[in-house]
């Protein structure tokens, strides 16, 4: 039995080796069938075929291949082959891209069937491979099938070798492949069909007589949910161009590798202009470029000029139509071969030996001439068909998706990426994703592949490469679902709209705000904004913006002070673009998409990049009022200065009231409903002389109607004002803008006010009342409105008594100070009763603004005071209380010595200090309780220590001074007050944008500039791809495989995150212990000095108060307060 087992094992290994070494399509199928029959395996059982084959073939060569494939299957995206269970997929065409798609779908667990109408792989064309393509094929075990695959500096392979390699890998995955079978048509499901497999497919066998098995197998309907390989194409015209492909036999098989003329392989045209110049003069061979690879064949591709082909007799007759020009009847094959041979000898410096042409599958020399004047690409990458409630997903990969130029490797590279995107789409389809979301993502990826993908963008050293789009394309603009509705084809359009609940829902990844504007709408908006500017004609979103004048005109339209448009020159492309990019970045926060030099170097800007960039201007300025193009600003200066004085009031209301963005079709003028409402409200202020004539009690019916309308509008605006300010506090940027704008407006109306420096509210000194400056007639006329302008005032402490004066008291005070204003306001109130309501609301808004200013000033003063050490605090207290006139209290009775004497209250609102209090004023019944400016805890502790202090103190001025110092010190060290940091004042009025409009201009790691097209984002930070590394091990990490530490702001890979957390905990614990010890030491060393300084300051204050009566020195002590830590 042992010998029989060894024989069986050896025979299976030999059969597997025969399968690996097969060199033709038919030979591979024959070897595979023999292997499966010998091992008693069923290829139809696709779910368990690979596992059974791996268990029965255990040779050392096979184990190396199984290890490669097992590592590939272990990726999390595949879910151990269960991501697409129950999904049947049909691949039409067995080319490299179709087979790579089939392998990826099989790894996801889908049932895959491949049909190919040929049974031979005869494409001798050599294919250039990008680095990531080489890495992907190595992960599939390409070296096990073809040992010379990309060895050393070789980065190319013949198409038939690549196709054969993928063909064998697909068979090992249990993929059902049928050759000599051609796709015919689709059969729609019946109305009463209940089977979930919805589309029936008929295939017919080719004329091959030995394919009876395939004919029997496919004669019955086969049903699928996904079909890959169907699509229409669209032509992109180019300049007239012809190319030759001719292949020579390489009889020296060992010479596969870099050729003596390797410098010609895959290089762009500018490098060969000097090399090809002599050929034009000697042999009349005019070539634009040439590419040469040496593999199993000598492979040449060159582009020739039309006149050169006519001179050499390759083209017989000259026709205007490219199709007629290159038809078989108009091409001399003998002259074509002679031309190809002569060009190859010249390009290789006559180093090639005498070689014969290779023979293609038609039995003819492998020399071809083709036209790539028009490049073809598919209009759509995928669509969904729905019939009778059943859906079919149709996708497209390969050459029909985008016509490639094979020697440069674009076809294989983009074809493999399209295969990965299609596999990801099928995976989401199998998991129940919405059709429109799938189509939107697929079309977005297609746009990126067609326009912005280069081999430098893809990094092959990312580990195992998967079908997840974020691995390949981390940042791409996703289209919205409504852009792909035409790709959802159904026969229910007449009775059911596509905007159903299951179709219009948006996924999280699709709802990108920057793609919300449609390109045609954006173009119309740009044309409207740039109309009237010289040398600016916007006809598209690409070439019209290259000169930079259109961008500068767009900025000048809304911010004319930023751009001197008249000084710009049309031929200065670099300067114009760089100026516009810098201004947009500095003033609006819009990151530049490129630089001025790069914009000038490109023939035409990328449309997708321009749409993304211009959409940010659209989102920023679409609600702003239009400014006319002012070419003669000098002449209009007087007109602008003669505007009515109520313009400031209207500007303030424009900032305060919420601005509604009017749609384009409705925005026919600047006067929206809201603007009309504002103008109507202040019409009564513009014409004060006409106010008495509009009396409500008049008998004029027309006047009554107008008055009622005006009252309703005033009430409506007052309600909007109240709702605006009773909501949550606005963000910092808007508050900053409003304060800056209103401060400028206040300077234009009133005399300039000098803001006093912020003072700690505990130690504010009494100030003399400053006489109010003479007010202009304009401010008196708009007294009720101009009072709303926020003026920064010192912090106000509550006075003993009511928390705030009532409205009646404030009216009386205002009447005493400005009687004329009161009379005028009364006349206004009698004329327009709603104006009084509006003034009350504005007065309430002023109170809210005052409170906010007080709180900010108090927080700033507290923060500055707490930054000082104990000595500086004591010196500060002594200097403050040394200059304050303390109240001259009489000697209180001993029974009341434990009460805290009153400290003089000081505020910017109190005109005079309180008068000296009598002995009765210091009694407990009449002494009002003083509230501290800071909220603190531990009142019991304060009461006990203050009792001990005041028992040991003497009476008179000394006790008052010491009491003031002691109470302040107790409040300082008992209050655990941590003020919020105040936002720094920005000099320039720069508007802050949401994350989806603006963008960072510096990398989070290297602090260098990062452009929109190259940046990545994670956790709200922007950075370069190469800078995204682990902070512990400096290893590059992916967006989906990182951990962010909020405490230290670093990114880590998953294995090192816990290590960094543990290390940070220990370091933080040691830092806190060391800081606590240092603080205790500082406190113990400075507490005695602080007490001594405070005592001396109190004595000096008493001596300088003006009382010449001698005061006996009485010993006293101040309690020692332990510091509060934590």
Swiss-Prot record:
Compositional bias per record (Pro residues), positions renumbered to this chain? 792-803
Q: Which SUPFAM superfamilies match?
A: Calponin-homology domain, CH-domain, FAD/NAD(P)-binding domain, Glucocorticoid receptor-like (DNA-binding domain)
**Residue numbers binding Zn(2+) 2:** 1030, 1033, 1053, 1056
For whether the record's keyword set contains Cytoplasm, the answer is yes
Q: Where is the composition biased (Basic and acidic residues)?
A: 805-824
* Residue ranges of every copy of the LIM zinc-binding domain listed in the record: 1001-1063
Q: What does this protein do?
A: Nuclear monooxygenase that promotes depolymerization of F-actin by mediating oxidation of specific methionine residues on actin and regulates the srf signaling. Acts by modifying nuclear actin subunits through the addition of oxygen to form methionine-sulfoxide, leading to promote actin filament severing and prevent repolymerization.
Name of the protein described by the UniProt record: [F-actin]-monooxygenase mical2
Which species does this protein come from?
Answer: Xenopus tropicalis
Task: Report which gene this protein is encoded by.
Answer: mical2
């Amino acid at each position: 039995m042992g010998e029989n087992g060894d024989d069986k094992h050896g025979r299976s290994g030999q059969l597997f080796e025969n399968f690996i070494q097969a060199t033709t399509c038919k030979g591979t199928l024959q070897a595979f069938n023999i292997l499966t029959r010998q091992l008693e395996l069923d290829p139809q059982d696709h779910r368990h075929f690979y596992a059974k084959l791996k268990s029965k073939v255990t040779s050392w060569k096979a184990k190396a291949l199984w290890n490669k494939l097992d590592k590939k299957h272990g990726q999390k995206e595949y879910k151990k082959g269960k991501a697409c269970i129950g999904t049947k997929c049909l691949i039409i065409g067995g080319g490299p891209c179709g087979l790579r798609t089939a392998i990826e779908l099989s790894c996801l667990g889908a049932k895959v069937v491949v049909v190919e109408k040929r049974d031979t792989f005869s494409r001798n064309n050599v294919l250039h491979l990008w680095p990531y393509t080489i890495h992907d094929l190595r992960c599939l075990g390409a070296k096990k099938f073809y040992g010379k695959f990309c060895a050393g500096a070789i980065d190319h392979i013949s198409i038939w070798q690549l196709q054969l390699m993928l063909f064998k890998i697909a068979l090992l995955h249990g993929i059902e492949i049928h050759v000599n079978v051609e796709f015919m048509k689709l059969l729609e499901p019946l109305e009463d069909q209940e089977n979930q497999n919805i589309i029936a497919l008929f295939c017919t066998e080719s004329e091959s007589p030995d394919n009876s098995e395939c004919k029997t197998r496919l004669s019955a309907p086969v049903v699928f949910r996904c079909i890959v390989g169907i699509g229409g194409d669209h032509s992109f015209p180019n300049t007239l161009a012809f190319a030759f492909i001719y292949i020579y036999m390489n009889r020296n098989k060992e010479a596969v590798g870099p050729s003596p003329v390797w410098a010609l392989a895959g290089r762009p045209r500018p490098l060969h202009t000097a090399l090809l110049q002599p050929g034009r003069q000697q042999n009349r061979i005019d070539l634009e470029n040439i590419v040469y690879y040496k593999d199993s064949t000598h492979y040449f591709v060159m582009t020739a000029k039309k006149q050169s082909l006519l001179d050499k007799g390759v083209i017989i007759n000259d026709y205007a139509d490219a199709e007629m020009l290159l038809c078989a009847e108009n091409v001399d094959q003998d002259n074509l071969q002679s031309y190809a041979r002569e060009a190859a000898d010249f390009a290789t410096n006559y180093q090639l030996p005498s070689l014969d042409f290779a023979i293609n599958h038609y039995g003819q020399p492998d020399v071809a001439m083709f036209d790539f004047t028009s490049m073809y690409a598919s209009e759509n990458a995928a669509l969904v068909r729905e019939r009778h409630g059943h859906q079919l997903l149709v996708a497209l990969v390969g050459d029909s998706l985008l016509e490639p130029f094979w020697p440069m490797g674009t076809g294989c590279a983009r074809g493999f990426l399209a295969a990965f995107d299609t596999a990801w789409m099928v995976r989401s389809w199998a998991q129940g994703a919405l059709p429109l979301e799938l189509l939107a993502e697929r079309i977005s990826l297609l746009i990126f592949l067609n326009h912005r993908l280069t081999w430098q963008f893809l990094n092959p050293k990312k580990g195992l490469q998967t079908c997840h789009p974020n691995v390949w394309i981390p940042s791409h603009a996703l289209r919205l679902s409504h852009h792909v509705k035409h790709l959802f084809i159904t026969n229910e359009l007449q009775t059911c709209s596509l905007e159903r609940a299951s179709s219009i829902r948006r996924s999280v990844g699709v709802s990108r705000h920057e793609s919300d504007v449609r390109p045609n709408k954006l173009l119309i908006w740009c044309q409207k904004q740039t109309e009237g500017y010289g040398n600016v004609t916007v006809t598209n979103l690409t070439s019209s913006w290259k000169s930079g004048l259109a961008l500068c005109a767009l900025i000048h339209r809304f911010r004319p002070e930023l751009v001197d448009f008249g000084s710009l020159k049309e031929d200065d492309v670099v300067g114009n673009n760089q100026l516009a990019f810098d201004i947009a970045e500095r003033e609006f926060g819009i990151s530049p998409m490129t630089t001025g030099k790069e914009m000038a170097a490109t023939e035409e800007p990328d449309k997708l990049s321009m749409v993304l960039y211009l959409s940010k201007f659209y989102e920023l300025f679409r609600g702003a009022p239009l400014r006319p193009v002012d070419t003669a600003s000098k002449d209009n200066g007087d007109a602008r200065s003669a505007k009515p004085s109520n313009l400031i009031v209207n500007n303030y209301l424009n900032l305060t009231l919420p601005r509604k963005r009017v749609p384009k079709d409705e925005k026919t003028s600047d006067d929206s409903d809201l603007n009309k409402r504002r103008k109507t409200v202040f019409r009564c202020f513009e014409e004060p002389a006409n106010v008495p004539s509009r009396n409500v009690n008049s008998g004029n019916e027309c006047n009554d109607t107008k008055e009622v309308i005006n009252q309703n509008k005033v009430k409506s605006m007052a309600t909007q004002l109240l709702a605006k300010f009773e909501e949550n506090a606005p963000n910092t940027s808007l508050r900053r803008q409003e304060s800056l704008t209103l401060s400028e407006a206040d300077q234009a109306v009133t005399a300039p006010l000098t803001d006093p420096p912020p003072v700690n509210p505990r130690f504010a000194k009494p100030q003399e009342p400053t006489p109010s400056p003479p007010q202009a007639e304009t401010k008196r006329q708009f007294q009720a409105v101009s009072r709303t302008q926020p003026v920064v005032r010192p912090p106000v402490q509550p006075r003993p008594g009511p928390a705030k004066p009532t409205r009646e008291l404030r009216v009386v005070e205002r009447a005493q100070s400005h009687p004329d204003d009161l009379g005028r306001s009364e006349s206004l109130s009698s004329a327009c009763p709603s104006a009084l309501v509006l003034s009350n609301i504005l007065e309430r808004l002023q109170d809210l603004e005052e409170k906010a200013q007080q709180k900010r000033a108090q927080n700033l003063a507290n923060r500055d005071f707490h930054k000082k050490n104990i000595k500086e605090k004591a010196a500060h207290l002594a200097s403050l209380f040394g200059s304050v006139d303390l109240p001259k209290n009489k000697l209180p009775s001993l029974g009341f010595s434990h009460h805290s004497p009153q400290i003089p209250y000081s505020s910017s609102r109190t005109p005079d200090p309180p008068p000296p209090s009598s002995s009765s004023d210091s009694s407990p019944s009449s002494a009002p309780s003083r509230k501290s400016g800071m909220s603190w805890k531990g009142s019991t502790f304060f009461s006990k220590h203050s009792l001990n202090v005041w028992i040991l103190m003497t009476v008179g001025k000394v006790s008052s001074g010491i009491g003031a110092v002691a109470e302040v010190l107790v409040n300082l060290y008992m209050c655990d007050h941590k003020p919020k940091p105040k936002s720094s004042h920005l000099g320039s009025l720069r508007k802050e944008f949401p994350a989806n409009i603006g963008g960072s201009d510096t990398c989070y790691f290297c602090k260098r500039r990062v452009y929109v097209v190259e940046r990545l984002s994670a956790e709200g930070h922007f950075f370069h791809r190469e800078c995204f590394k682990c902070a512990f091990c400096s290893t590059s990490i992916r967006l989906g495989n990182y951990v962010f530490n909020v405490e230290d702001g670093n990114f880590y890979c998953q294995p090192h995150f816990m290590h960094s957390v543990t290390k940070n905990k220990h370091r933080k614990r040691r830092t806190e212990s060391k800081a606590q010890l240092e603080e205790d030491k500082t406190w113990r060393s400075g507490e005695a000095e602080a007490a001594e300084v405070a005592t001396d300051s109190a004595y000096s204050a008493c001596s300088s108060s003006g009382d010449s009566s001698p005061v006996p020195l009485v010993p006293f002590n101040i309690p020692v307060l332990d510091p509060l830590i934590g």
